[in-house]
């Protein structure tokens, strides 16, 4: 039986196909009629395990190959037929296959895999639609095997895929012909390219097959170095690659419709990450496909691991060119004018320089021998220190750096000793404001500290924005329902995602203002009314594309080298309402855009008389699609320095070009976040909620929630038209205290929770805080911390206090703004004077009882003041 299996394998290798079947199977080859097939040798599983057998079989095949190899022409689908027995035949007399080289059955114990070649430009006569199923019978039973044909870029993958294979990789180059492996045993038709013939352009980067194919930072830069744009063709390929990977969670993976729809979609996909792993197994022979998979994983799940970051170069960004933005020229102008704005950004750059200096010093300190460091501190040294000063051996020592008077007082009441030397290594607890003040390499296991390593993944603005996307894998949580979209503008893919999102929200804003009669034509410019109509219809087209299904979006991306909203379309959507001279002076542009509208919209829609009704239709569809629909009105975005706090460097914009001018030429990492344009207000003023959250363990994850909070209110009334007034948009006390007459109105800038609850009851006639807002804050706190569980370094005797900032919209939905490490504990107002004292004392109770007094074993019935346990991970 073993010899029979080997003979059938050798015959199949001579038959121009590379097929492996799982089990004793019969393959009907009739569905492979129009596929260009290139010969490749087959190694059976036995041959791959036995080198001697492999050599002998190679010698046998060498003598047979020249006589048995035949060419198959695929210029016409009529040239190929399927025999009754399932073999492959041709009507061309000069290229007829002999019966010996075309076996009708294949049997053996190996997995099914088929190679066929991508179609070139000249092969445009191929049949557009072919059967996507091949009959495979095993012991008389029928199985279905999927086949995908990558003939041209315009041949869309989902036409030949099963419902379970919704994401397919588009072919990148159509000028070259390559072979593709398709694993028909898989439900998602995994694809990888063969390394023969020699790869070119973006694909000319081979890897060592014996090494794990992990896309490290060094390899990433090597890949970028080898893929520099050398000609227009390669630039097009590179642009396609970037466009395909701009499938961010909100637009493609989780953005296929309402929450219920896409969560069901992910369930049907059997977890996309599993499919990514399946892709990787097939793709180990070629870096390009493996690069596809790694980028997909980065965008969907693990982008927050900073080793994956790809820093953007604005002067070479393709997406900037599509905007018509001359980066080099703008940067030069900004440098020339920097003297005028130098004072405004001096603090930002100084802070960045200090951070770099601190990081450098820390790295130099870490370079010391760890064993040598350990000799500086031990339990015996601490015991001798206590003995020399007359303290009892069981007395605890603490060091506190910062204004934490209430915490110090409570610990002293419990018999703790304060070590006044902040540089000393003798302590049982060290409470500091900055993590750098504690050297983790010098910590004994029993010493307690109030920071975890790598906490920037949770507390930095770019860190939390990226890590929150991990939630789709933990609990299928939709972050768009509680976190305004946020993008890291220093990262290539994030920046491109932001540009596309800005365009979509701009189109949505145009329709909203038109429906509300805020977008009207000047009576003196009635001749431009047709251009306004064009603008409204283009905005409808943009929203239509935004709500495409995942399959259709991938199809659009794979065949189109331009952004989803093209430069010409954006040139109209981005212009001021009454500035239609551009279209009047460029009738060809108007004509092309009119053709796009005719092609992408129904005739009834493109010729609609009532544009308001049409705009309302697309706005309703957008509302169903986007959980953040109500946040947008005038397309306002807020830009923040990623690593700074206390409102430093924050600006709001409603136009793209001023925003880009603001972030360019400054050595600061920026994030752009959607501005909440429908905030709930208190006496016409914006406000946010400061909530304390405490993590005492990461393994198992244990989270406490402080059972009260306080409200921070902006100094001036909310006015979305005045974006330069920080006192109307930022509620930070460090901002408000600089306002005129602050001392007279200081009590108006903060509110107790009890007063806020009563204020809401007067408006709504019922409680909205405890029944809705607080529950949502708890869920957001749990989910945000869970998203960083794999990124933050756990330590048994550490804890950390976080300050969460929330906002509430007019529908009483709660939104996360940011998370602060070492939140301010200053007595800035009467409200904070009372609550800070309570909060620090209760935190000291957690330290004293939970970590010291033998209550390390978790017990949710133990109370630590107002600290309430809301989450305990099950081991």
UniProtKB/Swiss-Prot annotation:
GO terms for cellular component: cilium; cytoplasm; microtubule cytoskeleton. Residues 61-107 have a biased composition (Polar residues). Its EC number is 6.3.2.-. PROSITE patterns: TTL. It is found in: Cell projection, Cilium; Cytoplasm, Cytoskeleton, Cilium axoneme. Residues 48-107, 125-144 are annotated as: Disordered. It comes from the Eukaryota. Keywords: ATP-binding, Cell projection, Cilium, Cytoplasm, Cytoskeleton, Ligase, Nucleotide-binding. The keyword Cytoplasm applies. Gene3D superfamilies: ATP-grasp fold, B domain (3.30.470.20). One of its GO terms (molecular function) is ATP binding. ATP binds at residues 673-676, 686, 688. It holds the Pfam family TTL. GO terms for biological process: axoneme assembly; cilium assembly; protein polyglycylation. Residues 129-138 have a biased composition (Low complexity). Residues 517-859 form the TTL domain. Disruption phenotype: Cells lacking TTLL3A and TTLL3B show a strongly reduced level of monoglycylated tubulin and a moderately reduced level of polycylated tubulin. Cells lacking TTLL3A, TTLL3B, TTLL3C, TTLL3D, TTLL3E and TTLL3F display shortened axonemes that are resistant to paclitaxel, indicating that tubulin glycylation changes the lattice properties of axonemal microtubules. Axonemes are however normal at the ultrastructural level. Monoglycylase which modifies alpha- and beta-tubulin, generating side chains of glycine on the gamma-carboxyl groups of specific glutamate residues within the C-terminal tail of alpha- and beta-tubulin. Involved in the side-chain initiation step of the glycylation reaction by adding a single glycine chain to generate monoglycine side chains. Not involved in elongation step of the polyglycylation reaction. This is Tubulin glycylase 3A. It comes from Tetrahymena thermophila (strain SB210).
């Amino acid at each position: 039986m073993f010899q029979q299996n080997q003979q059938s394998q050798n015959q199949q290798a001579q038959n121009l196909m590379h097929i492996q079947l799982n089990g004793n199977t019969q393959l009907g080859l009739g569905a492979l009629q129009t596929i260009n097939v290139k010969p490749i040798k087959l190694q059976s599983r036995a041959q791959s395990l036995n080198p001697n057998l492999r050599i002998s079989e190679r010698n046998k095949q060498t003598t047979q190959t020249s006589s048995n190899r035949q060419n198959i022409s695929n210029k016409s689908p009529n040239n190929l037929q399927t025999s009754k027995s399932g073999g492959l035949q041709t009507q061309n007399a000069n290229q007829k296959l002999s019966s010996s080289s075309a076996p009708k059955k294949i049997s053996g114990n190996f997995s099914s895999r088929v190679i066929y070649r991508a179609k070139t430009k000249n092969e445009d006569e191929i049949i557009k639609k072919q059967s996507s199923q091949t009959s495979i019978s095993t012991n008389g039973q029928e199985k279905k095997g999927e086949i995908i044909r990558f003939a041209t870029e315009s041949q869309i993958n989902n036409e030949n895929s099963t419902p379970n294979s919704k994401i397919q990789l588009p072919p990148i180059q159509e000028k070259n012909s390559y072979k593709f492996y398709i694993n028909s045993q898989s439900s998602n038709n995994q694809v990888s390219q063969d390394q023969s013939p020699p790869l070119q352009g973006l694909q000319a980067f081979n890897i060592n097959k014996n090494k794990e194919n992990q896309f490290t930072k060094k390899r990433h830069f090597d890949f970028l170095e080898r893929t520099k744009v050398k000609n227009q063709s390669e630039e097009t390929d590179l642009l396609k690659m970037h466009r395909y990977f701009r499938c961010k969670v909100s637009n493609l993976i989780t953005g296929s419709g309402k929450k219920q729809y896409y969560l069901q979609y992910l369930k049907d996909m059997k977890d996309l990450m599993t499919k990514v792993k399946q892709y990787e197994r097939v793709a180990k022979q070629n870096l390009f496909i493996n690069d596809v998979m790694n980028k997909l994983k980065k965008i969907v799940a693990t982008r927050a691991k900073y080793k994956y970051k790809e820093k953007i170069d604005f002067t070479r960004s393709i997406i900037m060119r599509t905007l018509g933005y001359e980066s080099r020229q703008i940067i030069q102008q900004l440098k020339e004018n920097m003297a005028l704005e130098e004072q405004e950004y001096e603090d930002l750059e100084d802070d960045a320089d200090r951070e770099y200096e601190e990081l450098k010093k820390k790295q130099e300190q870490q370079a010391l021998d760890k064993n040598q460091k350990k000799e500086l501190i031990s339990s015996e040294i601490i015991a001798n220190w206590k003995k020399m000063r007359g303290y009892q051996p069981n007395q605890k020592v603490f060091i506190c750096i910062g204004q934490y008077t209430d915490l110090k007082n409570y610990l002293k009441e419990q018999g703790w000793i304060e070590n006044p030397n902040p540089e000393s290594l003798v302590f049982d607890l060290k409470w500091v404001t900055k993590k750098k003040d504690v050297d983790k390499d010098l910590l004994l296991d029993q010493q307690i500290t109030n920071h975890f390593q790598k906490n920037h993944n949770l507390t930095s603005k770019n860190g939390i924005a990226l890590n929150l996307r991990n939630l789709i894998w933990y609990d299928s949580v939709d972050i768009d329902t509680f976190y305004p979209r946020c993008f890291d503008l220093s990262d290539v893919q994030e920046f491109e995602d932001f540009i596309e999102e800005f365009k979509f929200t701009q189109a949505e804003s145009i329709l909203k203002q038109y429906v509300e009669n805020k977008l009207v034509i000047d009576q003196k410019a009635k001749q431009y009314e047709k251009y306004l109509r064009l603008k409204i219809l283009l905005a409808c087209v943009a929203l239509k594309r935004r709500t495409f299904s995942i399959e259709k979006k991938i199809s659009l991306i794979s065949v189109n080298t331009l952004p989803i909203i093209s430069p010409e379309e954006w040139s109209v959507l981005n212009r001021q309402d009454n500035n239609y001279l551009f279209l009047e002076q460029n009738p060809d542009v108007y004509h092309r855009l009119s053709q796009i509208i005719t092609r992408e919209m129904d005739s009834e829609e493109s010729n609609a008389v009532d544009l308001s009704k049409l705009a309302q239709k697309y706005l309703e569809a957008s509302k169903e699609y986007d959980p953040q629909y109500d946040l947008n009105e005038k397309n306002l975005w807020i830009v923040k320095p990623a690593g700074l706090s206390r409102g430093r460097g924050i600006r709001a914009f409603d136009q793209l070009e001023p925003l880009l001018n603001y972030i360019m030429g400054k050595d600061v990492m920026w994030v752009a976040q959607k501005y909440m344009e429908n905030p709930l207000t208190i006496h016409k003023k914006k406000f946010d909620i400061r909530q304390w959250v405490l993590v005492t363990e990461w393994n198992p994850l244990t989270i406490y929630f402080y059972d009260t909070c306080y409200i921070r209110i902006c100094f001036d009334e909310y006015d979305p038209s005045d974006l330069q007034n920080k006192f109307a948009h930022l509620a930070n006390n460090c901002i408000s205290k600089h306002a005129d007459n602050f001392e007279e109105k200081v009590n108006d800038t903060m509110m107790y929770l009890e007063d806020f609850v009563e204020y809401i009851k007067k408006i709504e006639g019922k409680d909205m805080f405890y029944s809705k807002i607080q529950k949502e804050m708890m869920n957001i706190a749990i989910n945000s911390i869970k998203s960083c569980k794999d990124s933050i370094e756990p330590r048994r005797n550490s804890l950390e206090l976080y300050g969460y900032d929330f906002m509430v919209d007019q529908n009483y939905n709660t939104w996360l703004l940011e998370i602060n490490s070492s939140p301010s504990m200053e007595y800035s107002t009467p409200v904070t004077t009372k609550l800070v004292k309570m909060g620090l004392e209760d935190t000291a109770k957690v330290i004293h009882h939970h970590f010291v007094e033998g209550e390390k074993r978790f017990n949710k019935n133990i109370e630590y003041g107002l600290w309430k346990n809301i989450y305990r991970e099950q081991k």
